[in-house]
Amino acid sequence: MERSHVGRDCGSRSSPRAFSVPTSNVPMKMSIPFRPKQSLGQNFLHDPNMAEKIVGTLTAPPEAHVVEVGAGTGVLTERLAERHDRLTALEIDERAVEVLRERVPEADVRETDVRETDWAALADEKGGPLRVISNTPYYLTSPILFALLGQRDCLAEAVLTMQKEVAERIVAEPSTKAYGILSVLLQLFAEPTLCFTVPPQVFSPQPDVTSAVVRIRFGPDTEPEDLHFDDARRYVRAAFNQRRKMLRNSLSAWTKEQDVGFPNDWGRKRAEALTPDEFATLARHLDAHADPVPDA
């Protein structure tokens, strides 16, 4: 089953209005009302056309509840508020919170650290499932992805702008250098699509890397049967933490030390050789035949 895509199915279904992309190589700019903090990983989007394109990637219907993570100066927030009556903006910087509450008064703006967000509680409060959108601070991309995966039952969709290298890892195929933990877990428990790249010039300050927008769909049809996320994550992490070793060595705590064999002679393969579906089969096998091993 194909569970990841590159550059496919990324058109907007949330609004009939089309966005325009500037033909000039010099993007339009919107003013930044305060100095970005490097400690918060702030690179503010200032191009209105790119903002329209990113917001247009969200497939949420008008009645859906949308949560923006790291709303910053409100470039996405304003456009989201035009499309959705129920909008929550999470922001850790008190300066940005003040700007957001003035600029987008109809949004529920909350001063909070996204790493402390209880997505299930927020979904219950707002009548979920939630749709998440974010120009993600690069240093928070992985924590946010794992947090969303861990609480995916209350989510329907996420549209995240991130470093292009990370986006490519998410949709990577087996037996490639980019294929790893994020690839397996996101392709197993969700449906990620790499939609388009975002040049550094549309941010202020300008980052040193190119970004990309990834849309991640969650739902019952993306859930593997009889497989618990925490168990799968434990096996996948152990396998890729020693990716140059054969699985019989990297997973020896569940196999060799417990006299448990591998299906299909997979013990002779490296982690990068197994597809996400094969990892699911292996995880079910270890769940059935091996005792749990505490996290290191």
Curated annotation (Swiss-Prot):
GO molecular function: 16S rRNA (adenine(1518)-N(6)/adenine(1519)-N(6))-dimethyltransferase activity; RNA binding
Principal location: cytoplasm
Catalytic activity: adenosine(1518)/adenosine(1519) in 16S rRNA + 4 S-adenosyl-L-methionine = N(6)-dimethyladenosine(1518)/N(6)-dimethyladenosine(1519) in 16S rRNA + 4 S-adenosyl-L-homocysteine + 4 H(+)
Annotated S-adenosyl-L-methionine binding sites: N43, L45, G70, E91, D113, N135
E.C. numbers: 2.1.1.182
InterPro entries to which the protein is assigned, alphabetical: KsgA/Erm (IPR001737), rRNA_Ade_diMease-like_C (IPR023165), rRNA_Ade_Mease_Trfase_CS (IPR020596), rRNA_Ade_methylase_Trfase_N (IPR020598), rRNA_adenine_dimethylase (IPR011530), SAM-dependent_MTases_sf (IPR029063)
SUPFAM superfamilies: S-adenosyl-L-methionine-dependent methyltransferases
Presence of the UniProt keyword Mitochondrion in the record: no
Biased amino acid composition, Polar residues: 12-24
Region: Disordered, residue numbers: 1-24
Sorted UniProt keywords: Cytoplasm, Methyltransferase, RNA-binding, rRNA processing, S-adenosyl-L-methionine, Transferase
Family named by the database record: Belongs to the class I-like SAM-binding methyltransferase superfamily. rRNA adenine N(6)-methyltransferase family. RsmA subfamily.
UniProt cross-references to NCBIfam families, sorted A to Z: ksgA
Name of the protein: Ribosomal RNA small subunit methyltransferase A
Biological source species: Salinibacter ruber (strain DSM 13855 / M31)
Gene behind the chain: rsmA
